[in-house]
Amino acid sequence: LSERTGLPAVSYNKHPEFKDRNIIIYMGGLYAGGVLGLSSTFRNFTLSDKQKLIIVTVGVSDTNQQSVISDIQNSMKNQISDQLFRRAEIYHLRGKIDYQNLSLSHRAMMALMHKSLKSVPYENQTEENQAFLDTYGKEADFTDLAFLNPIIEEINRN
């Protein structure tokens, strides 16, 4: 997205300042039922009337399934204020994962999640959890850069 728009990409770990920004775009990976860094980035933040927030989630789950989107958005509601959630333009993209390239801590987190989910009968799993179980330990790439186009159009409207 940064390459296609010329907008700078800043890691949530750098605690970016938003007060002087008209448009804020947060792009985060889905991990363990939440959007990585979302809650810490927007803790105690209120969007001004002149600001626009775009949140983009990226994961391996099939975002054509309404139940997957509902699961993601329900999780997001627990991560950010109601004001931010209501005002945000939210997009859900599919990305890729390669377990061999994950850090040791991420692999450990995924292993714990896998172990936990395996104990739940398959028919009782959410579609997001089923996708996790189906791709666990493998490389999976669902990236389609064409799905950036609606986000770029939204950015250009401002």
Predicted regions and their residues:
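Generic structural signal for residues in well-ordered beta-strands
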Residues: 7-10, 90
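Short, solvent-exposed polar/charged micro-motifs at secondary-structure junctions
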Residues: 19-23, 100-102
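A short, Lys/Arg-enriched amphipathic alpha-helix followed by its capping loop at the start of a domain
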Residues: 1-7
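Structural motif
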Residues: 22-25, 52
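Short glycine-/small-residue-rich Rossmann-like dinucleotide-binding loops
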Residues: 29-30
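Short acidic low-complexity segments
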Residues: 9-20
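FMN-binding flavodoxin-like domain, especially the glycine-rich phosphate-binding loop
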Residues: 33-158
